[in-house]
């Protein structure tokens, strides 16, 4: 894995030509940080834009339940990092997702010593879960989802994926179907809690704009938002 690091660096520099943020803080991806080691971080991994927005909803409850909590936020994409930056308060830290390599992950856990890890939706990385166990960091999958296709892909690599899902301390599923598939992979599903995204509260400006558009419509309008692969065709068949 260490031999592949130059290739990853080259890929990041190339991607930074279109999205400059990919070229910043590259060393964080390899477990090298400027922050000093502290303990008791609540670590949330929100890989991209959608997960970062879900993390905002989750954080509202966490900060109420744990006043003064210190957030360690990791992201994998530039859009995720940009959105995640909006969630930071004084004392919080944001770094890139560490590469799924034993030495990199060990440096990450030794640097921050998180109290727990909350992974959002589908972000289960075998080595990440395994090294978290080694370092005594309980990890949980929140707002968890698992499509039939993703389950089939995971089942092709049982030696890797089953220990990863079984190694999670707890899993909180969105739907009954998600829960059943996750249990099939060995996950400790604690229950069905719906989709956190439905708890989002639009601000007053958005609500007013929506009402304005609605009053201007002269014909019925149907909108599909945040659809998954295959859902558009199913909707068209139903109509």
Predicted segment positions?
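Charged active-site motifs of nucleotide-sugar-dependent glycosyltransferases
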Residues: 37-43, 215-222, 232-234
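Membrane-interacting alpha-helical segments
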Residues: 1-11
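Generic structural signal for well-ordered alpha-helices
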Residues: 59, 236-239
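Active-site and donor-binding regions of nucleotide-sugar-utilizing enzymes
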Residues: 9-32, 36-207, 227-229
């Amino acid at each position: 894995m260490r031999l592949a690091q130059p290739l990853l660096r080259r890929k990041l520099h190339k991607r930074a030509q279109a999205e400059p943020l990919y070229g910043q803080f590259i060393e964080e991806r390899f477990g090298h940080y400027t922050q000093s080691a502290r303990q008791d971080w609540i670590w949330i991994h929100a890989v991209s834009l959608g997960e970062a927005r879900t993390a905002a909803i989750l954080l509202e409850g966490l900060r109420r339940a744990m006043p003064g909590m210190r957030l360690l936020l990791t992201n994998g994409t530039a859009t995720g990092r940009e959105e995640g930056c909006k969630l930071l308060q004084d004392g919080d830290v944001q770094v890139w997702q560490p590469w799924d390599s034993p030495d990199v992950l060990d440096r990450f856990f030794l640097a921050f010593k998180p109290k727990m890890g909350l992974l959002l939706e589908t972000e289960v990385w075998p080595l990440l879960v395994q090294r978290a166990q080694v370092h005594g960091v309980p990890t949980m999958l929140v707002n968890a989802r698992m499509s039939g296709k993703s389950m089939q892909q995971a089942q092709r690599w049982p030696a890797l994926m089953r220990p990863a899902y079984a190694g999670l301390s707890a899993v909180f599923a969105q739907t009954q179907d998600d829960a059943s598939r996750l249990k099939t992979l060995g996950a400790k599903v604690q229950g069905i809690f719906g989709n956190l995204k439905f708890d989002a509260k639009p601000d007053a400006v958005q609500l007013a704009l929506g009402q304005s558009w609605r009053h201007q419509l002269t014909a019925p309008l149907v909108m599909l938002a945040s659809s998954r692969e295959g859902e558009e065709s199913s909707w068209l068949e139903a109509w």
